[in-house]
Swiss-Prot record:
This is Putative O-acetyltransferase SAS0844. The keyword Transcription regulation does not apply. Keywords: Acyltransferase, Cell membrane, Membrane, Transferase, Transmembrane, Transmembrane helix. Its EC number is 2.3.1.-. The lineage of its organism: Bacteria, Bacillati, Bacillota, Bacilli, Bacillales. It is found in: Cell membrane. It comes from Staphylococcus aureus (strain MSSA476). The chain crosses the membrane at residues 15-35, 43-63, 85-105, 150-170, 176-196, 212-232, 240-260, 267-287, 310-330, 332-352, 377-397. The keyword Hydrolase does not apply. It comes from the Bacteria.
């Protein structure tokens, strides 16, 4: 072994299959969450697991190089990262761009902008600027998941420079560790502060500044627990402690995958930090060369999946976005999920075998025009074929096919885009939906000319407002996009306190945008005194749907002046009622919900 100035040549760090096993758990959680978030409500925590692993592994590699050689070759590091990450992303972007042009051309402008952001690894800031909500998935945004890769790449660019600077200026490594810990606390504080001001999940979820805390915890672990310095034969007591802490942390993390959801507010008030600490304990145990938990995570099946975790992450969301765009959210047939999984596996395996691995080993030599090099030639031909439409998309050649909707609130329930689309109520003669008479005949009837109901609701009420007013001219309708039940009490006190008599009729359609408590519901109902109240329950593909409908049904049973309008039951199996989000209404849905309300009012 050649020695120069007290240092040896750099030796590769030992392979740690347990980390691949942990990657497998993380990516499976993410995929299940994106398939149907009600199956694994906290599956998105898998992203944080990846962040901690990245911080730990990258720092360990850099420290190992510095200890062996006395320097860190930044250029070589960045080239290795690009060879590892960029080719697979570029191929994904080319495929998604071409597929969007062929299958979803009206979205080509939005996807084009997302592609540009992804190329420069700024997707997270792009989505923040466009006020995109990560947790609402019914809008067609097949590249939205690349926000996390953007954060990691930004970290890979700046962190090595900072680390080298600190290593050269500060001799005591524990001091460097304290600096990174301090910055992680600042990042945590930023998340808590920004969230406390505006309650915006997406700003703190997407932000590099607010998510840096998780990556830096991995960095700190690399200083405390460098894998290249762990002993193969520690005392049995030490192994027992490591295994016990790692196992307990893993059990708690899996429980959190099932318990936490995107409405869990405490995760933004230190929760991500604490969950990442659990991940630290798991990593510490699976990278140790002699623990039994490391052997469990080194299971060949988990390692196989873990090695492909990057490809699986890249392709799963794009596949799900395309496939699910042809169905109503919340009413997706079971067989569709098998299609999702099958296509994800196929694309991920192709990417891993023919893109990731060759480019990681050979770099640009993985492409070759000479037919004698068959794999390289085929790869080159495919890339060039995809590159032509891809470049045309980027320069805007196909913009004429798209709608200029980039994403402002485009995938949030608090949106006017969907509602403006849904309110295109065209006169249709002789339409019949499950026994409904035509709109024209109903409007010509004077049955409802003399009733004066008050209707209060959210964006679904906005959807039916115009049609309902045409049938009940004296109705008073107050619908607002994004409204929640707890926000309605002050509104009622200020504007509708006169609706208290037994002859008054009040329709409340609330619960689309969030849950509420029994007390909040009762306080609202009590404001209407003896008035006849009609509660419209919800159909919304969110985890709170069942609880909202249960509370509304219970209120109807408890209070003699309250009637339940069971929109959930009425709309079951009627995908034609809904826009792609599974919540807002198409014209047939407008007529159906209006009919349910009118029938209830007529009975009383």
């Amino acid at each position: 072994m050649n020695k120069t100035k007290g240092f040896t040549k750099y030796k590769k760090m030992r392979y740690m299959p347990g980390l691949d096993g942990l990657r497998a758990i993380a990516v499976l959680g993410i995929i299940i969450y994106h398939l149907n978030k009600q199956w694994l409500t906290g599956g998105f925590l898998g992203v944080d697991t990846f962040f901690v692993i990245s911080g730990y592994l990258i720092t360990s590699l850099l420290l190992k190089e510095y200890d062996d050689t006395g320097i860190i070759k930044l250029k070589s590091f960045w080239i290795r990262r690009l060879k590892r990450l960029l080719p697979a992303v570029i191929v994904l972007l080319m495929v998604v761009g071409t597929a969007t042009l062929l299958l979803k051309s009206d979205n080509i402008i939005r996807v084009k902008h997302d592609i540009i952001a992804a190329i420069f690894y700024v997707s997270n800031w792009w989505y923040i600027a466009k006020d995109v909500n990560y947790f609402e998935q019914f809008s067609f945004m097949p590249l939205k998941h690349l926000w996390s890769l953007a954060i990691e790449e930004q970290f890979y660019i700046f962190f090595p420079v900072i680390l080298v600077t600190l290593l050269l200026t500060i001799k005591k490594r524990y001091k460097i560790g304290f600096i990174f810990w301090g910055v992680s606390i600042i990042s945590l504080g930023l998340m808590m502060f920004i969230y406390s001001i505006n309650g915006d999940h997406s700003r703190v979820y997407f932000g590099t500044d607010t998510r840096l805390q998780t990556l830096l915890l991995g960095v700190i672990l690399a200083f405390l627990w460098p894998p290249f310095k762990l002993k193969n034969d520690p005392p049995k007591v030490v192994k027992y402690v490591i295994d016990s802490i790692g196992s307990l942390s893993f059990i708690v993390l899996i429980l959190l995958f099932f318990i936490i959801n995107d409405e869990t507010n405490w995760i933004y008030d230190g929760g991500f930090y604490l969950i990442s600490i659990l991940t630290l304990f798991i990593i510490a145990s699976v990278v140790h060369p002699s623990t039994w938990i490391a052997k469990i995570f080194s299971n060949p099946v988990l390692v196989f999946i873990g090695k492909r975790s990057y490809s699986l992450y890249l392709w799963h969301f794009a596949v799900i976005s395309f496939v699910h765009s042809y169905y109503v959210d919340g009413q997706i047939p079971v067989y569709v999920y098998f299609i999702d999984i099958s296509l994800t596996i196929i694309f991920a395996e192709l990417s891993y075998r023919f893109i990731e691995t060759p480019f990681r080993k050979e770099g640009i030599k993985a492409l070759n025009w000479r037919p004698s090099y068959i794999p390289q030639f085929i790869r080159m031909a495919i890339v060039v074929t995809l590159l032509i439409p891809f470049m045309l998309i980027l320069v805007g050649a196909f913009n004429k096919y798209g709608k200029d909707i980039i994403g402002e609130k485009a995938n949030s329930f608090d949106t006017t885009i969907e509602d403006n689309y849904l309110m295109r109520i065209a006169p249709i003669d002789n339409i019949h939906i499950d026994g409904l008479v035509s709109e024209k005949k109903k409007e010509s009837s004077d049955v409802y000319n003399n009733i004066k109901p008050l209707l209060i609701g959210d964006s679904v009420m906005v959807d039916i407002g115009e049609s309902f007013k045409s049938s009940v001219p004296k109705s008073r309708i107050d619908g607002k996009v994004g409204r929640q039940l707890y926000q309605t009490l002050p509104l009622v006190k200020a504007n509708y306190s006169q609706y208290k008599k037994s002859s008054d009729q009040v329709v409340l359609e609330l619960g689309t945008n969030g849950d509420f408590t029994v007390k909040q519901l009762d306080d609202l109902l009590n404001q209407f005194g003896k008035a006849k109240i009609y509660l419209v329950n919800t159909r919304v593909p969110r985890i709170y749907e069942a609880n909202v409908n249960r509370l509304l049904a219970d209120a109807a049973k408890r209070k003699s002046n309250v009637t339940l309008i069971d929109w959930n039951k009425r709309s079951q199996g009627h995908s034609e009622y809904f826009a792609p989000d599974g919540v807002h209404l198409e014209y047939k849905g407008v007529l159906a919900l209006k009919d349910e309300i009118l029938k209830a009012l007529k009975k009383k």
